[in-house]
Amino acid sequence: MSGRIVQIIGAVIDVEFPRDAVPKVYDALKVSDTETILEVQQQLGDGVVRAIAMGTTEGLKRGLDVVNSGSAISVPVGKATLGRIMNVLGEPIDEAGEIGEDERMPIHRKAPSYAEQAASNELLETGIKVIDLVCPFAKGGKVGLFGGAGVGKTVNMMELIRNIATEHSGYSVFAGVGERTREGNDFYHEMQESNVLDKVSLVYGQMNEPPGNRLRVALTGLTIAEKFRDDGRDVLLFVDNIYRYTLAGTEVSALLGRMPSAVGYQPTLAEEMGVLQERITSTKTGSITSVQAVYVPADDLTDPSPATTFSHLDATVVLARSIAELGIYPAIDPLDSTSRQLDPLTVGEEHYNTARGVQGVLQRYKELKDIIAILGMDELSDEDKLTVSRARKIQRFLSQPFFVAEVFTGAPGKYVSLKETIRGFQGILDGEYDDLPEQAFYMVGTIDEAVEKANNMK
């Protein structure tokens, strides 16, 4: 059934249909003679619906015919999507021909019911020391990478994808939501060079896209991940960046004429976040482990967008500018980062005690910093001097060369097993390496490499 455009305001388009054939909310409409797809957001009465454009509205004019597809936007799913880059509509944008999918699924679906959901306490080893030690990931859990501009969220995410694809040979889905096109391009070539592209499906809705596109692209990626999960696989879903999803929602909300709430965000912020996050879950057939980069505006974690995201996560990895300034990468704050899995019943006594020991030493060092700044190191007791020395070694040992950063650093990347991570940090806490210079611990993998580096420095 067709209607016609009656009003265009930016990305918002009003379409009039016969009263007995008004489209449902979330139905996809196609503007005739163009490739433009619209998604119905509101029914205004008198047969008029308000829709958001999924692409540019240039060249559209009043009176153009619009055809109702009668269903929501549907996208290709399954193995055909691996190694391909798609847009929000599931169309290929990598110039490698058709996707050739066997099946398509609508992007709007209900979250799995309570009966279908399954919880798991199995740990997912990432090979990144600071994450495995202080904020371990659960298989089928949700992780947030929080950080301001330029502290390394995307690089950390790329390293996680590389490590998990190489070491665990699982499928991953990457949804680029409102990020830089350059990063998307770098990411694609990085995956190609690491030979893991055939295990990753990529869905991009970058910064230059209209808000409707950026609001829905996360759902497109999630739908592809859900299909892998329903086929009995353990899949990883990477979203970069969840803040841009919220931001796109804010833009759409304003365009639809809703009254803004705190800090200008949409009044439906919590609900929109919930709709996405509740679908990212594990069922009895398979699991979705999700890693989401969360941009923190002005480094303020109390901003409504990151604050709303917090409540949905099992683990939070906080990237701190103060650590990046010291030249320690990954710039993860071991005192601010948390995980539900860091529990002696889940990770075991040894891991738990080592992690808490590391945090205790770093916390004490943080408290002593003021005294050192005013009075100097000489005024500290011998015990405190030892604590400071160990803390500085731990701080440097938390750094690690990344595979995806080899191009910038020139240092080969390192994957460190959980067993080696615990052994190294426990050794520093026990004082086994008190005689080594702290510089030996900087940018190495295992503790044995630190010892070797110290010997070479002599």
Curated annotation (Swiss-Prot):
<dbReference type="GO" id="GO:0046933">
    <property type="term" value="F:proton-transporting ATP synthase activity, rotational mechanism"/>
</dbReference>
<dbReference type="GO" id="GO:0005886">
    <property type="term" value="C:plasma membrane"/>
</dbReference>
<dbReference type="Pfam" id="PF22919">
    <property type="entry name" value="ATP-synt_VA_C"/>
</dbReference>
<keyword id="KW-0406">Ion transport</keyword>
<comment type="function">
    <text>Produces ATP from ADP in the presence of a proton gradient across the membrane. The catalytic sites are hosted primarily by the beta subunits.</text>
</comment>
<keyword id="KW-0472">Membrane</keyword>
<keyword id="KW-0375">Hydrogen ion transport</keyword>
<keyword id="KW-1278">Translocase</keyword>
<protein>
    <recommendedName>
        <fullName>ATP synthase subunit beta</fullName>
        <ecNumber>7.1.2.2</ecNumber>
    </recommendedName>
</protein>
<keyword id="KW-0813">Transport</keyword>
<dbReference type="InterPro" id="IPR020003">
    <property type="entry name" value="ATPase_a/bsu_AS"/>
</dbReference>
<dbReference type="Pfam" id="PF02874">
    <property type="entry name" value="ATP-synt_ab_N"/>
</dbReference>
<comment type="similarity">
    <text>Belongs to the ATPase alpha/beta chains family.</text>
</comment>
<dbReference type="InterPro" id="IPR003593">
    <property type="entry name" value="AAA+_ATPase"/>
</dbReference>
<dbReference type="GO" id="GO:0016887">
    <property type="term" value="F:ATP hydrolysis activity"/>
</dbReference>
<keyword id="KW-0066">ATP synthesis</keyword>
<dbReference type="InterPro" id="IPR055190">
    <property type="entry name" value="ATP-synt_VA_C"/>
</dbReference>
<feature type="binding site">
    <location>
        <begin position="147"/>
        <end position="154"/>
    </location>
    <ligand>
        <name>ATP</name>
    </ligand>
</feature>
<dbReference type="InterPro" id="IPR005722">
    <property type="entry name" value="ATP_synth_F1_bsu"/>
</dbReference>
<dbReference type="InterPro" id="IPR050053">
    <property type="entry name" value="ATPase_alpha/beta_chains"/>
</dbReference>
<keyword id="KW-0997">Cell inner membrane</keyword>
<comment type="subunit">
    <text>F-type ATPases have 2 components, CF(1) - the catalytic core - and CF(0) - the membrane proton channel. CF(1) has five subunits: alpha(3), beta(3), gamma(1), delta(1), epsilon(1). CF(0) has three main subunits: a(1), b(2) and c(9-12). The alpha and beta chains form an alternating ring which encloses part of the gamma chain. CF(1) is attached to CF(0) by a central stalk formed by the gamma and epsilon chains, while a peripheral stalk is formed by the delta and b chains.</text>
</comment>
<dbReference type="InterPro" id="IPR036121">
    <property type="entry name" value="ATPase_F1/V1/A1_a/bsu_N_sf"/>
</dbReference>
<dbReference type="GO" id="GO:0045259">
    <property type="term" value="C:proton-transporting ATP synthase complex"/>
</dbReference>
<keyword id="KW-0139">CF(1)</keyword>
<keyword id="KW-0067">ATP-binding</keyword>
<dbReference type="InterPro" id="IPR024034">
    <property type="entry name" value="ATPase_F1/V1_b/a_C"/>
</dbReference>
<dbReference type="Pfam" id="PF00006">
    <property type="entry name" value="ATP-synt_ab"/>
</dbReference>
<keyword id="KW-0547">Nucleotide-binding</keyword>
<dbReference type="InterPro" id="IPR004100">
    <property type="entry name" value="ATPase_F1/V1/A1_a/bsu_N"/>
</dbReference>
<dbReference type="InterPro" id="IPR000194">
    <property type="entry name" value="ATPase_F1/V1/A1_a/bsu_nucl-bd"/>
</dbReference>
<dbReference type="InterPro" id="IPR027417">
    <property type="entry name" value="P-loop_NTPase"/>
</dbReference>
<keyword id="KW-1003">Cell membrane</keyword>
<dbReference type="GO" id="GO:0005524">
    <property type="term" value="F:ATP binding"/>
</dbReference>
